[in-house]
Amino acid sequence: AFHYAQLADVDSNAQAFLKSNMQAKYVKDCGIMCRHYKRAQQQQMNMKQWIK
């Protein structure tokens, strides 16, 4: 989030993120979605593939 916020000078989406009062929620939701994605990925693999 910090590096994204630094792009506010050149990126209009980053600028909108900085102006939002829901930054913490967006970061939290992103973390949750990453966990869901990793879990789904893991469920499609066997143990050997996951460890590799």
From Swiss-Prot:
Subcellular location: Host nucleus
Enzyme's top EC category: isomerase
One GO BP: DNA replication
Keyword vocabulary terms for this entry: ATP-binding, DNA replication, DNA-binding, Early protein, Helicase, Host nucleus, Hydrolase, Isomerase, Nucleotide-binding
Pfam families tied to this protein: PPV_E1_C
GO cellular component: host cell nucleus
InterPro entries xref list: P-loop_NTPase, PPV_DNA_helicase_E1_C, Znf_lg_T-Ag_D1_dom_sf
Family named by the database record: Belongs to the papillomaviridae E1 protein family.
Name of the protein: Replication protein E1
Gene: E1
